[in-house]
Design a protein with these regions (language model features):
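Glycine-rich, charged/polar anion/phosphate-binding loops
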Residues: 50-53, 105-110, 126, 160-162, ...
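Aromatic-residue-lined binding/catalytic grooves and analogous aromatic/hydrophobic interfacial grooves
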Residues: 41-46, 55
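An aromatic/glycine/proline-enriched structural segment found at the starts
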Residues: 65-122, 127-129
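Well-ordered, non-membrane alpha-helical segments in soluble/globular domains
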Residues: 45-49, 76-79
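M16 family metallopeptidases and their MPP-like homologs
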Residues: 1-43, 61-71, 119-140, 150-255, ...
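A short, acidic, amphipathic alpha-helical segment used as a generic capping/interface helix at domain edges
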Residues: 47-53, 255-267
């Protein structure tokens, strides 16, 4: 189902497109074409090697930062070791020329045929990145729809192994999904039905509280010392400062049912999904 969600949201952000091309089913097609080209044309293999070498040199020329996680008394020695290795590295500093690839942008639905008696369904709507004020309501909305409607409709009644909704701030997408699902069209109808359920039936405050607490607890979940350091480093590199996290946490705690209905109308009703 991760592949299905990736396909549906493939063109909703630059990162989503990159992930689809590099790690998704799109990459599988690329690898198939590459192998075929190499088998039919000897120069194709050398062209691949040349391209990989150019990418490697481009990485070596790029600005670098090193993250070192260790015990305090070892830090000075290990920093010296890292510096010694990189200072001795000889790098060709001539300009790096890489093949430019024209992006293929399409919002068409896709279906991939597999040898199985079950389906993996996904439906994606364009959304906002995580710093946007609507990101918090969309995060809560995903859990709210999953707990309040989708789990029952898709798993308990529909017979799928699982299903739900998720908001992805990197892909800038709000996605519905199911996995190992004996149904197809009926599941997509359930995705739509969850929207109608939220907008047109009475909602209970305790369900909202459960969705919010689930998100906040996942944010506050402790990790290992090394894991915490690594996470903090990459978060800072991408502007996810402690102040940013506090702001997001406060926004999550302040989400109301009216907020859920507002973002549902704006992002799910007034936009067409990609399936």
């Amino acid at each position: 189902h991760s592949y299905a969600m990736q396909i549906a949201s493939r063109n909703m952000s630059a990162l989503a497109k990159r992930d689809y091309d590099n790690t998704g089913l799109g990459a599988l097609n690329w690898l198939t074409r590459l192998v075929t080209n190499i088998e039919q044309d000897e120069s194709a293999y050398q062209n691949l090697i040349n391209e990989l070498q150019a990418i490697h040199r481009g990485l070596l020329l790029a600005p670098k930062q090193f993250l070192l996680v260790c015990e305090e008394h070892q830090s000075e020695h290990l920093v010296e070791e890292v510096q010694e290795v990189w200072n001795k590295l000889a790098v060709d500093r001539s300009p790096v020329l890489l093949t430019e690839v024209e992006p293929e942008v399409s919002q068409n639905d896709q279906a991939w045929l597999i040898q199985a008696n079950v389906q993996f369904c996904a439906s994606a709507y364009p959304a906002v990145e995580v710093a946007h004020a609507d990101a918090a309501p969309l995060m809560v909305l995903a859990g709210y729809l999953r707990n309040g409607f989708l789990h029952s409709a898709i798993r308990e009644k529909g017979g799928a192994y699982g299903g739900g909704a998720s908001y992805d701030g990197n892909a800038c997408a709000f996605r519905f999904y199911s996995y190992r699902d004996p149904r197809l069209a009926e599941t997509f109808a359930d995705f739509e039905a969850s929207i109608n359920w939220l907008l047109n039936t009475e909602q209970k405050p305790h369900q909202l509280e459960e969705a919010i607490l689930g998100l906040v607890s996942s944010m506050d979940k402790p990790g290992s010392p090394a894991g915490e350091a690594i996470t903090a480093c990459y978060a800072l590199l991408h502007g996810r400062t402690p102040a940013f996290r506090r702001t997001l946490r406060a926004r999550l705690l302040n989400v109301t049912l009216e907020d859920l209905k507002r973002v549902t109308q704006a992002y799910l009703v007034e936009q067409k999904p990609v399936k």
